[in-house]
């Protein structure tokens, strides 16, 4: 769509990564073989005679709701604020959840697909799903890398790394007593 000049919002897309569909903002309405349905465009296969509506009352309403839900997790994200303005989304519609992570997966996927480090991963499922650094790997791989940090649309990753580093990456004890 982008190569054809069609703008579809997304928070989880990166040119170096495989499509993921995690943010759901790229939702579109497709019509094929007499059926109409909403799909995540970045992972939906193109087929002959497929009709795609990137903007409609229904698509815009769903995107607005998705943005309002994401804003409950990351109300100060500049990217979310920009999209919220485009779709007239209310950042106060849902009760705030102080997690700040919107589970776009950019950090997890970049670390795995580009860096081949697997130092970050998804932990748990459903409403308990989180992004977490794998201490044994992150202690070695992340200190000199941090290439995933600027990809995070909410800045959650930087805060999570600082906390993880403080709690889980202690200096190795020396022969002269405990590490300082």
Regions found by a protein language model. Give the residues of each.
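Fe-S ferredoxin-like electron-transfer domains
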Residues: 24, 32-180
